[in-house]
């Protein structure tokens, strides 16, 4: 797939707000769609309908957002289900107008190999071309992927005063058609769906050398502006592949596209792809990953008769 289509542009994740989405509530409990108790009960009794709804929603979203807004020429995705049955999807999208990352990095590597003592001064003609290409890439990334919290100052100094999650009523119960103030709505969605605020040993905390750390790397260091780091500029000897670090003013914020989040109205993720090796490794992992059997079903089959 990667050999045929080339390096995909973005990696994406979409989760379900199946207890909040009003469209699903009207489908599975039309008599009382505003009751959280009725929604929860109907969801447990109609898991197949909820799964169909998610499947239909993401395919429509692919057509309207990824193909229509971002100009995707192709995509790949893989569905997963949590133990309680709530689905999410991981995927890749190839965007037609995206800068060719591999060409830029290859040209930079060739330049450094041929001129090991180069200072990378953009005043030279060849360096100027590479500098312009990298700048074009950075501008495209800034339009496509964000780790900026609009409710926080650029330097992140007031992040402690960021809005709290909006859960009563939950922000995801409001359909996009009823949004009056886009920026205020986006800030509420970010606060509720995109901030990694609940680290726990059961979920993400791992102990290494006696120190507990989040396996997702939160809180992440702040970044004043988006940067493209080549292999030789990285501290790790294990990974010399290029890395893109997006501008960040909130160390707990998961990456997203503002239009993606506003329209989907549940937790999302979007990251820019820079490594063919990592993409192939990722696809192989998720394409061959099996779903764990549910504990109740296993108990039913193993329970002695009588």
Regions found by a protein language model. Give the residues of each.
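Intrinsic low-complexity, intrinsically disordered terminal tails and linker regions enriched
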Residues: 1-89, 93-306
